[in-house]
């Protein structure tokens, strides 16, 4: 069902992409396209909430941008608070008056996990506040099982999409121009 939603909304794209991690791929998942349609956002959020419910989450936190809407929808179905972390001078922060209490059970959610970099930053941020990060959830896991957050990781869909280091990218070697649709802007 999730893959069909991604295809129907145009969220599953083909081309030459530079991922937020700096790696390259011939496939990209732009979940913002999925969230153009609130009915699909609700389906995805509810399904992810079902997977995370067993962790007794009090607060759901998503990294901006990919986790902002997702954290809200998942939190709604979990009857939890929803926060998002965003970069300030390249560092993930809780801003806008957001806070977590020491011991608060938090879930970190992200639309797509490839290397898990943003999620790991949010986990560290929450630990600095004393939160108890109990799980991570994503719509799509494209990590190939290579990411370890130190807490359970639940995803709605595992996609084995090609990922290349820039120096080994066959698309670059073919001279195909790359798009950079991600939001981190670090690489």
Curated annotation (Swiss-Prot):
Orotate binds at residues 114, 142. InterPro entries: OPRT, Orotate_PRibTrfase_bac, PRibTrfase_dom, PRTase-like. It holds the Pfam family Pribosyltran. The keyword Glycosyltransferase applies. It is an enzyme of class 2 (transferase). Its EC number is 2.4.2.10. Gene3D superfamilies: 3.40.50.2020. The keyword Transferase applies. 5-phospho-alpha-D-ribose 1-diphosphate binds at residues 110-118. Homodimer. Catalyzes the transfer of a ribosyl phosphate group from 5-phosphoribose 1-diphosphate to orotate, leading to the formation of orotidine monophosphate (OMP). This is Orotate phosphoribosyltransferase.
